[in-house]
Amino acid sequence: AREKKILLSDMDATIIENETLDDLVKLSGVETNVDETSKLAMEGKIDIKTTLDTRLNYLKGKPKSLIDQALARIKFHPGSEVLVKTLNQKGFITSLVTGGFAPISTFVGDRLGFQNVISNEFKFKDDCFTGEYVPITAGKNSKLNYLNKLTDEKNISKSQVVAIGDGANDL
């Protein structure tokens, strides 16, 4: 039972180099220190939901087209595509589980070949950000809850999971 069977990966600053929500705030033209807010959240010094709410508020009323600009700036970490492709070929279940947002997470997941993409979802009205979202992975234990559900459904031991991430909420 030591053989690994699941890859659970974070997205921002892990499988890609970017912090995509920070990129969106910067692209929107709002003057703020989002990098520091993100850093504190990743260190567990600020609640992840609070920091998401704060950063999304900066996007309220901004055009949805900012997403296309953010997608154009995504930098994949070297080897990320090979990692996912190889593990898929070896029969792993590969899941991108991120506090980031669809459609960015969907783009990254599809591009790299993840079988599952679990993320929050932006809400839009009249092609603009509303500042609200569907909080699928916003909770402190959201990623752990997903892992528990997946391992229970597949009857796989947690010792058979490879999890990679950079933040306090990354298992």
Predicted regions and their residues:
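Conserved active-site and cofactor/substrate-binding residues in soluble primary-metabolism enzymes
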Residues: 19, 32, 46, 62, ...
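Residues that form generic nucleotide/phosphate-binding pockets
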Residues: 27, 37-40, 54-58, 70-73, ...
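Short connector loops/turns at beta-strand edges and beta->alpha or beta->beta junctions
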Residues: 29-30, 61, 122-123
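Metal-dependent phosphoesterase signature
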Residues: 51-81
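C-terminal cap/substrate-recognition subdomain and adjoining C-terminal extension
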Residues: 69-171
